[in-house]
Curated annotation (Swiss-Prot):
Residues 268-305 are annotated as: Disordered. One of its GO terms (molecular function) is protease binding. One of its GO terms (biological process) is protein secretion. It is a multi-pass membrane protein. It is found in: Membrane. Its main location: membrane. InterPro entries: ABA_GPCR_dom, Golgi_pH-regulator_cons_dom, GPHR/GTG. This is Golgi pH regulator homolog.
Length: 547
């Protein structure tokens, strides 16, 4: 093995850039010649590693910021553009939950594409899940309780205390949710990431199955011609006339309310002026009476006058009180009329709201009837029949036979098709790429559908609850929904995609349970939605026939 002495100097050749050595006669020290190559290789590897880590961190941070900005924009410009949410922490909570949720899906796609450093991808995945768990289990519920207690007018210290008590009760109930369900393969301790994610997944999976059961029935219902109701133009015209007539009545009654309030204001101004004049007269009589009593001992000739003067004040007060009672009785009549008119206006506005809804639904029904006569509408009609039967059958078979995720649907379908046509194609390679595309489409569709659903829920209940409470509820449901989506995707995707990033961290979770629970909730949700739509269809038909 070549060695270098301690005085060997490594220098670079100015012309060729090579390495030359200067030997000396000193004793050799046994330093291997490849040590320098190892050092250079280590430094190069460290620099490459540092560059990879820096780019990985930059990608994660920038993507999180972009998701946060998109969530903030969606919050202000779409979801709550007609409502006022003054709490900045509420807006931050929604946007952060939205960004963390989308980052979960982003990391799954990066795992499929083998993008970013693998070790740091694992760390970011664990970091994201930990933040989501803390946010959904502790932060959002506590602030929700804080706003609810604060609305009752308690002091800040009492509000913090009662909110903490409610949070403890909530945590006990939340932890008890997972006891009846086999969410873990083995016990991992009282508090662990798997325990929290597993319980979050139960609630999120329930919400997902309810929405899916509703959508699986309502979408075919929208296209199947059997459920379409005949709509006459005469019916729409009649309802529009009633709507316009009610609008005129509302306008006239509101005009009367404005005139009565103006008249009431004028009378109040006149009453205040009269009160000031009467008060001055009453003070003058009292002052005159007091002066006369003070001069009683000095002027005995005025005793008769002084004895009569005290009677003037009480008599005037009685006359004033009688007049004031009559005046207030006159004022109460316009007030009663205003209250009666406001009640009538509210009834008419409720009637108009119902009429507007009926007109809108009838026009949509007429558009659906026109669409059903087209070639595309007929195709959607048969497609609606197919999916309405297929999804219920698939869920029922999964429950009855306890089917678990094996080969993913894309690989199975591609394998059957290629065997039938006798094509020699790498099924595993192409199924992975097709699965990746379908997973992306499925994720985008799921996010879009969920955002539309929470938009409908907010507009439905925003008048009965505080906007801040609605935002926190939606943020919590959204986070649970996305976590349960990841758990559901674990058994639907090929194992090679999620073997490291999902199974490595959440390996103790019983993923197949969530599919069975989804099917168990999906079927009742679909059946209830079917019965509700049939009942609504018949009731609306009877209503139209009555008109």
């Amino acid at each position: 093995m070549d060695t270098f002495t301690i005085e060997e100097i490594v220098k670079f050749d100015g012309g060729g850039g090579g390495i030359s050595t200067i030997n000396s006669n000193n004793d050799n020290i046994g330093i291997p010649s490849n040590t320098f190559e190892m050092i250079i290789s280590t430094i190069q590897h460290f620099l490459d590693r540092s560059s990879s880590v820096a780019s990985t961190i930059a990608v994660f941070v920038l993507s999180f910021i972009l998701f946060f900005m998109f969530g903030w924009f969606y919050f202000l410009k779409i979801l709550f553009r007609d409502y006022e949410v003054k709490k900045v922490f509420v807006q931050l909570s929604f946007s952060i939950t939205f960004a963390l949720s989308l980052t979960l899906f982003e990391l799954i796609f990066f795992e499929i594409m083998d993008f970013m450093d693998r070790e740091w991808r694992y760390r970011f995945w664990e970091f994201d899940l930990t933040l989501m768990s803390i946010n959904l289990i502790l932060v959002l519920p506590y602030y929700q309780f804080y706003l609810l207690v604060l609305a009752y007018g308690f002091s800040k210290r009492k509000t913090l205390f009662f909110s903490l008590v409610l949070l403890v009760l909530y945590l006990i109930l939340f932890w008890k949710i997972g006891d009846p369900f086999p969410i873990l393969k083995e016990y991992t301790g009282l508090v662990s990431l798997e325990m929290g994610i597993g319980r979050i997944g139960i609630v999120g999976c329930t919400v997902m199955s309810l929405l899916s059961g509703y959508g699986a029935v309502y979408v075919p219902y929208s296209y199947i011609t059997y459920f379409l109701k005949p709509v006459k133009d005469v019916t729409i015209t009649k309802l529009e006339k009633q709507f316009n007539h009610a609008l005129d009545k509302i306008f006239n009654k509101k005009k009367r309310v404005v005139l009565l309030k103006r008249e009431l204001t004028r009378r109040n101004v006149n009453n205040n002026n009269n009160n000031n004049n009467n008060y001055d007269t009453y003070n003058y009589n009292n002052n005159y009476n007091n002066n006369s009593n003070n001069n009683n001992n000095n002027n005995n000739s005025n005793n008769n006058n002084n004895n009569n003067l005290p009677i003037i004040g009480p008599i005037f007060s009685k006359i004033y009180n009688l007049w004031n009672v009559g005046y207030h009785h006159q004022l109460s009549r316009p007030i009663d009329d205003i209250k009666q008119l406001e009640r009538e206006i509210k009834q008419l506005e409720d009637l108009n709201r119902d009429l507007f809804t009926q007109i809108h639904e009838l026009k949509l029904e007429r558009l659906r009837i026109q669409f059903s006569t087209t070639l595309r509408g007929k195709f959607y009609n048969w497609l609606g029949y197919f999916f309405s039967i297929y999804w219920k059958k698939k869920s029922a078979l999964n429950i009855v036979f306890d089917r678990r995720g094996g080969m993913d649907p894309v690989t199975r379908g591609l394998d059957i098709a290629l065997r039938y046509f006798h094509f020699q194609v790498d099924v595993t390679f192409w199924s992975q790429h097709i699965s990746f595309i379908l997973v992306g489409l499925m994720t985008a569709s799921s996010i879009r559908g969920f955002l539309n659903q929470i938009l409908k829920v907010f507009h439905e209940y925003s008048s009965s609850l505080s906007s801040n409470n609605i935002v926190l509820i939606l943020a919590q449901v959204m986070g649970m929904y996305f976590i349960s989506s990841v758990l559901m995707m674990r058994t639907s995707m090929p194992e090679i995609y999620t073997r490291f990033i999902v199974t490595q961290i959440l390996g103790d979770i019983e993923f197949s349970f969530y599919h069975r629970w989804f099917d168990f909730i999906f079927i009742p949700s679909a059946i209830i939605t079917t019965l509700a739509l049939i009942f609504m269809s018949k009731s609306s038909t009877f209503h139209l026939n009555d008109e």
